[in-house]
Amino acid sequence: MNTALKIILDKIRRYYRQYKMLTIRDGWKKAKWLKKHKIFHYIGENVYYTPNILPAEPFLVCLHNNVAISAGVRLITHSIAANVFNHEEDTNKYITDFGKIEIMDNVYIGANVCVNPGVTIGPNAIVAAGAVVTKDVPAGTVVGGVPAKVIGSYDNVKEKTLNKSKQYGGVTSGQLFVKDLLKIKPINFSIDEDGEKK
């Protein structure tokens, strides 16, 4: 097969995958589709994937078991700095740098996180929303910020979440919708729906 045809087929494949990411709205179903079609290097069990964008090289991404990835997360598998250097010097001696991203068991990644190439996120870790992960994340930690730094522990967040869950009186995950939970533990704003102060 000639190079031009390979490039065209690759573009069609990429556009089809992107279409699927936009049309499959449920994170569980999206992860199952990615796993079924072997888009990533590996996807374990109980993976929840909500981003609408796939990494440029999805085969460089490995998601272990019980991983939840929120909307807007970008998994960056390469740096295009080489393009800038090649154009600057009118050469082709600089090669694009690629790196794997491996996300271990029991990891939650918050909304709009950017994970850079070559990063491993250790087991039992949480990445706070908006973080930019430039280095490996140690096991059992919570990281946040730009660049991401350790700001807490996984076990502390787990304990706080359990304590908050107990406020709902023994209801278990998945039994009720948000509106049902708000009847048990109401949330009050300082203004009503019409903008009037309470």
For each feature predicted by the language model, list its residue ranges.
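Membrane-proximal basic amphipathic "stem/tether" segments
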Residues: 1-40
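C-terminal segments of enzyme domains that contribute to small-molecule binding surfaces
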Residues: 25, 94-109, 114, 148-198
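Flexible, glycine/small-residue-enriched loop-and-beta-strand segment within the central core
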Residues: 30-34, 50-120, 146-147, 153-155
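Soluble, non-transmembrane catalytic domains of enzymes that act on hydrophobic metabolites at membranes
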Residues: 42, 59-62, 198
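Structural motif
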Residues: 45, 65, 104-105, 120-124, ...
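Hydrophobic, membrane-inserted alpha-helices
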Residues: 47-49, 127
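Beta-rich strand-turn-strand
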Residues: 111-127, 131-135
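Conserved active-site beta-strand element of glycosyltransferases/polysaccharide synthases
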Residues: 143
